[in-house]
Amino acid sequence: MSETNVDSLGDRNDIYSQIFGVERRPDSFATFDSDSHGDISSQLLPNRIENIQNLNVLLSEDIANDIIIAKQRRRSGVEAAIDDSDIPNNEMKGKSSNYILSQQTNIKEVPDTQSLSSADNTPVSSPKKARDATSSHPIVHAKSMSHIYSTSNSASRQAKHYNDHPLPPMSPRNEVYQKNKSTTAFVPKRKPSLPQLALAGLKKQSSFSTGSASTTPTQARKSPLQGFGFFSRPSSKDLHEQHQHHQHIQHNNINNHNNNNTNNNGAHYQVGSSNSNYPQHSHSISSRSMSLNSSTLKNIASSFQSKTSNSRKATQKYDITSNPFSDPHHHHHHHHSSNSHSSLNNVHGSGNSSSVMGSSSNIGLGLKTRVSSTSLALKRYTSVSGTSLSSPRRSSMTPLSASRPVMSASSKKPQVYPALLSRVATKFKSSIQLGEHKKDGLVYRDAFTGQQAVDVICAIIRTSDRNLALLFGRSLDAQKLFHDVVYEHRLRDSPHEVYEFTDNSRFTGTGSTNAHDPLMLLPNSSSFNSGNHSYPNSGMVPSSSTSSLNSDQATLTGSRLHMSSSLSQQKNPAAIHNVNGVFTLLAECYSPTCTRDALCYSISCPRRLEQQARLNLKPNGGLKRNISMALDDDDEEKPSWTSSVSKEDWENLPKKEIKRQEAIYEVYITEKNFVKSLEITRDTFMKTLAETNIISADIRKNFIKHVFAHINDIYSVNRRFLKALTDRQRSSPVVRGIGDIVLRFIPFFEPFVSYVASRPYAKYLIETQRSVNPYFARFDDDMMSSSLRHGIDSFLSQGVSRPGRYMLLVKEIMKSTDPEKDKSDYEDLSKAMDALRDFMKRIDQASGAAQDRHDVKLLKQKILFKNEYVNLGLNDERRKIKHEGILSRKELSKSDGTVVGDIQFYLLDNMLLFLKAKAVNKWHQHKVFQRPIPLPLLFACPGEDMPALRKYIGDHPDCSGTVIQPEYNTSNPKNAITFLYYGAKQRYQVTLYAAQYAGLQTLLEKIKQGQAAIISKTEMFNVTKMSDRFFDYTNKINSVTSCDGGRKLLIATNSGLYMSNIKRQQNKDHRHKSSAFFSTPIQLVQRNNITQIAVLEEFKSIILLIDKKLYSCPLSLIEAEGNGTSFFKKHHKELINHVSFFAEGDCNGKRLIVTAHSSSHSIKYFEHEHPLLAEKNGSGSGNKKSLKKKITEVIFDSEPVSISFLKANLCIGCKKGFQIVSISQNAHESLLDPADTSLEFALRDTLKPMAIYRVGNMFLLCYTEFAFFVNNQGWRKKESHIIHWEGEPQKFAIWYPYILAFDSNFIEIRKIETGELIRCVLADKIRLLQTSTQEILYCYEDYRGYDTVASLDFWG
């Protein structure tokens, strides 16, 4: 074959390889003369085109001839344009213009982003994929995408080397590459996700693509980020081109070793320079899935610098083998070619030389930019700086915890790494002191001032430069960590500016790493195998997809190991915020060659100013962005009064009058701006949200109703107010005054009160929609970036701050108003000022109440009860959260200040609540840790032990829960606090620990205040001691009753019957109150076990129950002279035997005595006969049955436990429920209707019904466990509550609107209608003695063992 044919065949093969990506196989059919086809007759032509013989050869030959002729014409012209510094001369001749187009075409440089059509959609299980994965060979460099779209010289060289040097044989699958210091190993890189800070800029570029990406062959499971196009795998064509380029690199190495004798002992290795024999390329196996412009790359590079100067200098002094990231054991691949080996040795030079990719490469849309030696995309993961070649050299590494900001004015180590916004934000939230601050007349709770914020940031980043701290704070403000309470401006270093956290969350869980943190994507495996290569001691998962901006694999591996150890050693404290990013002013340069004395190549290096100062260089201005500011369209109104009128109108006025006119004009101009903002809110926000689907249709109406509540009312009033001000302002250049206008419109400002009160809930709705509704979040962001320059929060907050501005504006006018000259206006302004003060007070009250109510509602949504539900009364509109904080079940060590307690407590105005946060399916649930403790039953003591409560409880009659001090004055170094729940059914004691002693003292003080407030609200219950130190444990009081019009008291005890006189006297402390006391009791009858007593004064009889026998005795016993025991024996009458207890009362117009008999499950009742009637009927005094009529007995199926009197019937409480007994019909039936399914809880046999009371047209049934309402048909009242007792009461008393339940340890006082516990009176062994309309008598045992009689006086 001739030389021409040889060249033609080579060009054909070259073209075929470039088009199809594989080597053309030899022809398997015989060739023929291409010119002879013209002689073929039409009769010999086949009917189908696919049947034409050798059609493919004919077409390819014609195409090849056209291309070859075009190339030969342009070959001489293109050769002159080749860069001699990049490619050797012997390779340039005749190989530079391998265009595959017959006509000269200008090809525009396009971004090297994979399109949807070029994405590799081959299934993972395809054999083709397996061949691609196994055919990958370790190479020194991989081509960047810039060479794919480069000039033809690279294509020519590529084709030549592909034809001259076939692919080497594949390595065995189990082959392990030997480690060698002198060879450069390249590990296939895993493509990390782009930094979050750069994603926003990338998405705005037209070249940003999120094409479908398949999983890597070595990893069958799909990565979480591959669905977003962050990870991609190369196509088969890319892998084939990598082998071609590998051979191309080896051929260049041979030529460099033979023809170039340059001694490379310098400190830098420059790719693409005149001294380098390597072509331009970056480290990439496949094409990038993202395209970056220069500004985005600059932002990424400047945002992820993480190395300090001191640590860099220290680590660079280490030996080569001391760095684990540059250790030869980390290089897992090397080349088999000795030529490549020697060439690399020649290039690298000495082992301590620093290597930097200093050349320019085409990135994105053809923009020239520097390629860093370290992957920019990895800067968020690590602080390790590596080189672009994995040669054995030192690699500096700086842990995050050891970083120090360059600009810090203090030499102390910062508390956290100041460049990471997330860590500083977490420390900021835990360090800032929240409190109440006032702005524009409104009080904001859980807020802080701008000066406080700057102080805390200065302390965190260890700097005295407040401007730097202010810039840092505004970075946190920009990411919505906190905001101005009125959304007017950014952070300011002022004690008068008030800010609050954006989340305003009261629920802070335990510290944990965010599941969405990109750091969690790092693998933690120690070794793995992939394909036919082994990766020992590596924490990296190999992947065929990579980024063209990645660094060497040693850096990646080292960074992963470093960050994995950092994650295992450092626990991020509780930080519920979305702040993320890098503060570049405090970050360190990522370049390993950047020192304090050498100018860094990067223009955005943080040390650049310092380096320029050291080198005496003049700083260059650099490129500047042309920022176009949106101008206000309304330029009609002048900013000041003097500019709005002519100079002749004000030049002769005194300065005080000018100042007054400026203040009046400010009222007018600010009111106009406020009305304009209301119009924008109405026309832009309300209308858009109402007419579009930004808010879902099911909640749209409710959202607009509450978020924009009272906007139209305010606009209606202020529009007329503005019109009045406008007319006054235009009536004369010099306004005489506006006091009358302000005073006239203040009564119409009432919608502001309702508007301010609706803001907490409106803010909650907005934040909820912003977090769950991406359309609403985008809408709000679009409004902020539009000409409005403010979001919905800013516009809605103006209505909150406007009433306070009125006060400030009126006050400013009064300062400049002469009381003598402008007397009328000054008086109007004074009246308006007083009216505005009252108005602001009502706004503060409404705002505070609304905020309290909103906080309680949020708390109600979070609470989850583990076992028994407890009614916390959170539906009460008056419920408030007094204090909250975090405690721990374990002691917090002094050294570990970042440990967060696991118990969240909430001190309400009625009880103390403990919650424990737990994350379930990414939702923070707050489970009740212990049963909530009502404040009247709460005892708190600083320390780990609770003193004995007997002397505290029995010391005074009105004892209730309180804060007590330990018995011994010992220190409390552990900051422990012990809580005791003084309940009957749920008594428990728990000890928790506070982080700080001040927090412990604050909690105890808040508990004291809450308990004192409860007692002050129930002053109508006067608990006084009437008798003590007489009845000891051998002579217990069983029952008492009053007689002689309440002046005498009969006391039944275990040893007999006593009588005492009741005396009253004025209280010295409160003259309008009187206190009662008993005289020394006198024994009337000496009989043992008198368990119950009753006096029937109208029948002049005393009823006694002695040893289960019911006796009657004349009332004259109390006036009998001499021994009362003998008088009782002579005049008493035995009525009934085997009586468990009895009761007397009026029923159906009769005075009945009812006795209960437990043994026979029955009751007996009879009517007591008047003694005078008995004497008239001739009954003798010795007749035993003279005082009673016929005895009626009613038998039940269970034991009777209580007796209650209704108007016409008896209600007997049996163990199986209440039974109604008809006196007239002598029959009984169940009170509760079993047809009511809502009463299943009250139909248990274990319940003990104790009392029934008529309340209106309903009946209150009291059991030992609970109480509830039923109607006269025995059905439960609809939507009625159930009162659950804290104790197990045996007796009840009612004093509307309160119900009193007597347990042996305390008395519960509750509201009948709501069941709310308002007061508890604590004592030991309490027994109810007597109830009346004025007072209740009960007795208890004091700490000395004496029975003490006390009175609950309702009238006082």
From Swiss-Prot:
It comes from the Eukaryota. The keyword Acetylation applies. InterPro entries: CNH_dom, DBL_dom_sf, DEP_dom, DH_dom, PH-like_dom_sf, PH_5, Rho-type_GEFs, WH-like_DNA-bd_sf. Residues 1034-1336 form the CNH domain. Residues 329-338 have a biased composition (Basic residues). GO terms for molecular function: guanyl-nucleotide exchange factor activity; phosphatidylinositol-4,5-bisphosphate binding. Residues 74-94, 109-175, 202-291, 303-362, 383-409, 531-571, 626-645 are annotated as: Disordered. The modification N-acetylserine is found at S2. Keywords: Acetylation, Guanine-nucleotide releasing factor, Phosphoprotein. GO terms for cellular component: cell division site; cell periphery; cellular bud tip; cytoplasm; incipient cellular bud site; mating projection tip; nucleus. The modification Phosphoserine is found at S76, S193, S223, S566, S628. Stimulates the exchange of RHO1 GDP-bound form into GTP-bound form. PANTHER family: RHO1 GDP-GTP EXCHANGE PROTEIN 1-RELATED. This is RHO1 GDP-GTP exchange protein 2. It comes from Saccharomyces cerevisiae (strain ATCC 204508 / S288c) (Baker's yeast).
